[in-house]
Amino acid sequence: MLAAYAARQSADDPLSGLEVGERPDPVAPEGWTTVTVRTAALNHHDLWSLRGVGLPADKLPMILGCDAAGVDESGREVLVHAVIASPGWSGDETLDPRRSLLSEVHQGTLAEKVVVPTRNVVPKPAGLSWEQAACLPTAWLTAYRMLFTHAGVHPGDTVLVQGAAGGVATALVQLGSAAGLRVWVTSRDAAKGEAAVALGADAAFASGERLPDRVDAVMETVGAATWSHSVKSLRPGGRIVISGATSGDAPAKAELTTIFFKQLQVIGSTMGTRDELERLTRFVAARGIEPKIDRVLPLARAREGFAAMHAGQVDGKVVFTL
């Protein structure tokens, strides 16, 4: 079958290890199902795998990809949930210390077929296109859990999204706007801030700019570069939900005094559960949300999508079709 896979790894030249070609068809073990992939989406996780982060070298060659939508063995249209719990685990799979994502231990979704545990598929709502459905299982699920599981916000509350352009940030803007939140964004690039406003944000500010009001919650994926601003922007009792640190994880100042004096909460968040993915798909379909897609390419041209993401030339999701 056709697949995009990591054949080698290089921290300096990640694209050198990407191959697009034939791989053996997967065989589903007992309790797993085979999904024939219709669409799959690209994530920065795939580039990190090519750099050698999170993917052990002894697992190569590894088919990349966490996001996919397709048809399961019974003919149902489904989305694939990428978080694989360890055998015997019950409860929230994101808390399983032995969990993995597709393409870390088990072969990923950038292929004609992928095998996953039977519980790791959720129905695709009829109102979602194949391309839209493929956008949801990673970045959008991460955003959904941040906003609706951890942030503790309600319609009318103000949420600050640090960094307007990333995949999670874009999803936060679209989800927050649809949920009746007042969404503010920051960006170093005025054009990207304007693009976020066009997607539904209520206002955009320069990175680090003093805000007109304190906010109820901050959605943090940037890390060190925005940490102090995030802490200082919160009202007393507010929450920072952090799911990434793209600028580094060691801020110059931890702001501990402000955190305890203002009784702030700092909450870590990673991916989401299968049930959250199912709720997300229903929410997106019911509200008529259209995930922002930068480009749609056949999987045979996967290298073009990887190269665009590596160069920072994407604005929205890159989706591959099969």
What are these regions (language model features)?
Residues 82-163:
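NAD(P)H dinucleotide-binding glycine-rich loop of Rossmann-like/cofactor-binding domains
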Residues 186-190, 221, 244, 270:
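N-terminal Rossmann-fold cofactor-binding loop
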